[in-house]
Curated annotation (Swiss-Prot):
CDD domains: GroEL. GO terms for cellular component: cytoplasm. The gene is groEL1. This is Chaperonin GroEL 1. GO terms for biological process: protein refolding. Its main location: cytoplasm. It catalyses: ATP + H2O + a folded polypeptide = ADP + phosphate + an unfolded polypeptide. PROSITE patterns: CHAPERONINS_CPN60. Forms a cylinder of 14 subunits composed of two heptameric rings stacked back-to-back. Interacts with the co-chaperonin GroES. InterPro entries: Chaperonin_Cpn60_CS, Cpn60/GroEL, Cpn60/GroEL/TCP-1, GroEL-like_apical_dom_sf, GROEL-like_equatorial_sf, TCP-1-like_intermed_sf. Belongs to the chaperonin (HSP60) family. Pfam families: Cpn60_TCP1 (PF00118). Gene3D superfamilies: GroEL, GroEL-like equatorial domain, TCP-1-like chaperonin intermediate domain. It is found in: Cytoplasm.
Amino acid sequence: MAAKDVKFGNDARVKMLEGVNVLADAVKVTLGPKGRNVVLDKSFGAPTITKDGVSVAREIELEDKFQNMGAQMVKEVASKANDAAGDGTTTATVLAQAIVNEGLKAVAAGMNPMDLKRGIDKAVIAAVEQPKRASVECTDTKAIAQVGTISANSDSSVGNIIAEAMEKVGRDGVITVEEGQALQDELDVVEGMQFDRGYLSPYFINNQEAGSVDLENPFILLIDKKVSNIRELLPALEAVAKASRPLLIIAEDVEGEALATLVVNNMRGIVKVAAVKAPGFGDRRKAMLQDIAILTGGIVISEEVGLELEKVALEDLGQAKRVAITKENTTIIDGVGEEAMIQGRVAQIRQQIEDATSDYDKEKLQERVAKLAGGVAVIKVGAATEVEMKEKKDRVEDALHATRAAVEEGVVAGGGVALIRAASKIVDLEGDNEEQNVGIRVALRAMEAPIRQITKNAGDEESVVANNVKAGEGSYGYNAATGEYGDMLEMGILDPTKVTRSALQFAASVAGLMITTEAMVTDLPQKEGAGMPDMGGMGGMGGMGGMM
């Protein structure tokens, strides 16, 4: 086991504080409408230019191991805020730095660290209730656009495209961000249920220009097994042919004789039919087939529940207004399923999302909700260069998370005003002893840090602005973009309540642990091993000079 280097007390805290300040100083320059860029060197390709706090934090590793521990703890604050609300990483970092700096000053002056931490925790618990009370519901498109704009560093085009996407696919819809091919941002909306399985044979294509299969008002047969024998499908095919409507077969697979017969029937015009594989694998496939059944008002033909393919009747089949199938995707538009059944299924999946532990499972379940309840929108980010594309994509993703948080818990006045108001509401809070009172004051002072940093980045006088805003009430604040004072809600400067709350909670949590640190342990650097001895000359070769 390698030897360790141990530092105690003030020596440890000073080193840790240096690391905190290095990381926080790099991150906080990005805060606010006039936040600056940070350039990140990459081991390959062009450098990345970003205004995203968590991207900057993730890049920082310090050479001094004690300083690095401090930096990594603040990085944890940014990551936790990002995971919880998707935004507010820079605000959380600024708050953590302020609490640690003020708190360690008090510890150096001889205060009890544990009582300081209790005071800070008491102040934060009281403070996070204030934004919740002041929160305004964020339901209309204009407010959503404003939240997106603020989060994307005052880029209104980003706010507008996110608001448009949310309007089209609803709150439960899935919105993804991709790199586009054009200079302008584009929005693609897929209505209905789309899954990534295409036609099983190109001979099903009936729209030659688009290279797709278009079925109008089709029946949909859902089968939870492989089908290779055509005899199993004959009753369903005959029933559909009598009804003179097309048929879409979604099965685990359709192969051999069954597929060949379907192709021949389709080409001869006896019955208009197409077959695709069911989406997903294993249990997820069963669940998605059930989703499609509920959406289209059909049932899944599965031997597990005693349903046989040979005994299928028309009433067992699902229906939709239209189905479009390309080489890669199948889209079912306007299924005829009952609204109550669909809502019940959505509620059931939402419960599974709450119980799910892995992010991957949550993401897949969220996609299923979107396909049942709303739709899927894709924002294609446009830019002139690859460097700009990466920077803009980061901002769009941040803005998207912020708008989701705003829709979930509402919005409060932005620009650091919500924290100033929260601090003013709890200014009379008392701890159990004087040292806890100092902890409360540390937290209250730290809550001014975001507005001070926003003002500083805009090139204005931070103390003047902070005092003017403190003298006001409600949503009165300072618009750093224009240099004007006024009602932040009316000016459209909004922060999601969840983002403000999460930033303060995570910052105080990690900062409290750092204040109560008394020892730090790290590996000693490895000493260079002794090199191999020089190889001497070969003996007996000295007299060879005379042979020349």
